[in-house]
Amino acid sequence: MMDVNEIRQYLPHRYPFLLVDRIVEINLNDSIIAYKNVTINEPFFNGHFPNHPVMPGVLIIEAMAQAAGVLGFKSMDKKPEDGSIYYFVGADNARFKRPVVPGDRLQLEAKIIAEKRGIWKFECRATVDGQLACSATIMCADRKI
């Protein structure tokens, strides 16, 4: 398990763009389970949508990518402070199955499916109460900064 203070050691993101609150399970070189608590206080709800708040799909994908980023960094035994960054370089087959709204706990799952020359590919899912909200294949690149 990792709390937000430890997560911040592995992700360069900060408020309002840190979208992982806790890691509940991590299996190095394999998979991760994390979550994001979605509250009405999220800044994006001011405009998306004022009378019917829904978490933007691109931010659900970003949350999955951040969870995958923690898995990648931990699997490589690296941190951003070591001069490495994990760029989000692509998403394939993204599908949205249900809206994510204030009060939801978004569970984020990522599984490594390939790694070659610093390009990592993950099969990702985001669920709420066991219901699929989003799925995508996400690619990230480990690069020196």
From Swiss-Prot:
<dbReference type="GO" id="GO:0009245">
    <property type="term" value="P:lipid A biosynthetic process"/>
</dbReference>
<dbReference type="GO" id="GO:0019171">
    <property type="term" value="F:(3R)-hydroxyacyl-[acyl-carrier-protein] dehydratase activity"/>
</dbReference>
<keyword id="KW-0444">Lipid biosynthesis</keyword>
<dbReference type="GO" id="GO:0016020">
    <property type="term" value="C:membrane"/>
</dbReference>
<dbReference type="GO" id="GO:0005737">
    <property type="term" value="C:cytoplasm"/>
</dbReference>
<comment type="function">
    <text>Involved in unsaturated fatty acids biosynthesis. Catalyzes the dehydration of short chain beta-hydroxyacyl-ACPs and long chain saturated and unsaturated beta-hydroxyacyl-ACPs.</text>
</comment>
<feature type="active site">
    <location>
        <position position="48"/>
    </location>
</feature>
<keyword id="KW-0456">Lyase</keyword>
<protein>
    <recommendedName>
        <fullName>3-hydroxyacyl-[acyl-carrier-protein] dehydratase FabZ</fullName>
        <ecNumber>4.2.1.59</ecNumber>
    </recommendedName>
</protein>
<dbReference type="InterPro" id="IPR013114">
    <property type="entry name" value="FabA_FabZ"/>
</dbReference>
<dbReference type="InterPro" id="IPR029069">
    <property type="entry name" value="HotDog_dom_sf"/>
</dbReference>
<dbReference type="Pfam" id="PF07977">
    <property type="entry name" value="FabA"/>
</dbReference>
<keyword id="KW-0963">Cytoplasm</keyword>
<keyword id="KW-0441">Lipid A biosynthesis</keyword>
<dbReference type="GO" id="GO:0006633">
    <property type="term" value="P:fatty acid biosynthetic process"/>
</dbReference>
<comment type="similarity">
    <text>Belongs to the thioester dehydratase family. FabZ subfamily.</text>
</comment>
<keyword id="KW-0443">Lipid metabolism</keyword>
<dbReference type="InterPro" id="IPR010084">
    <property type="entry name" value="FabZ"/>
</dbReference>
